[in-house]
Regions:
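Non-heme Fe(II)/2-oxoglutarate
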Residues: 1-92
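A short, polar/charged loop/turn motif at coil->beta-strand junctions and beta-hairpin connectors
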Residues: 8-11, 98, 140, 184
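A structural signal for short, well-ordered beta-strand segments and their strand-loop junctions
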Residues: 16-19, 98-100, 167-168, 189
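A short local loop/turn or secondary-structure capping micro-motif enriched for an aromatic residue
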Residues: 25-26, 123, 176
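Conserved double-stranded beta-helix
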Residues: 62-71, 80-142
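Catalytic core of non-heme Fe(II) oxygenases with the double-stranded beta-helix
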Residues: 109-172, 184-188, 194-198
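Short proline/glycine-enriched turn/loop segments at secondary-structure junctions
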Residues: 177-182
């Protein structure tokens, strides 16, 4: 499996790993992310606590790539996921990795992720599906795809269920999401560089 994943990754610039997280882990992270976003929204709008708000420490609803989504850099819990996932990801892609940073977003209705490539600190990245609420959508089993333009220029629609992740070459492959129809969708991004790189 590892050699097949590595081959696919090298040929396409990405690879999907199903069931990376167990349900008890992704369910806990999903509740944490929803509660954190809710708490920070209250902190920002409440006259009693708005002076306590710090965008860099508490997160923000202002994200250039996904306007309106709540996002947070370097959450200590997600940094633990970043560190503890490194060896598994290194084994899959056969690259000695060094963690650079974690980032997470809680998307809401009509959010999109603009088409982009990642910055140099994201040579090897993952987007990890934590959970989503699409109970407002009539389409049965609605799943919000991430689009990835593979090395050969072909655009692939990648569906992730909670616990699944896609590992991709963040600086090399364009990726994006169209408008989200559901109520919320939680994703964690784990970013790494080649330990022996430039």
């Amino acid at each position: 499996m590892i050699s097949e994943s590595k081959k696919y990754f090298n040929e396409n610039g990405y690879v999907v790993i199903q069931n990376f997280l167990k349900p008890e882990i992704y369910c806990l992270l999903y509740e944490y992310m929803k509660n954190k976003a809710r708490r920070e929204l209250i902190k920002q709008i409440s006259p009693k606590s708005s002076h306590l708000y710090d965008k860099d420490l508490d997160g923000s609803f202002i994200d250039e790539q996904a306007p309106g989504a709540f996002s947070l850099y370097g959450d200590p819990l997600m940094d633990a996921v970043l560190q503890n996932s490194k060896d598994f990801i290194s084994n899959i892609i056969e690259v000695d990795l060094i963690p650079t940073y974690s980032y997470w977003r809680l998307y809401i209705t009509n959010n999109e992720l603009k088409k982009h490539k990642d910055r140099p600190s994201c040579e090897y990245s993952t987007t990890l599906c934590i959970g989503y609420d699409t109970s407002n959508v009539e389409e049965e089993k609605y799943n919000w795809p991430i689009y990835i333009k593979s090395h050969n220029g072909e655009v692939k629609s990648v569906m992730l269920n909670p616990g699944d992740m896609v590992i991709y070459k963040g600086c090399d492959v364009e990726h994006w999401r169209n408008n989200f129809k559901g109520l919320n969708h939680a994703q964690v991004f784990l970013h790494y560089n080649n330990k022996n790189g430039k």
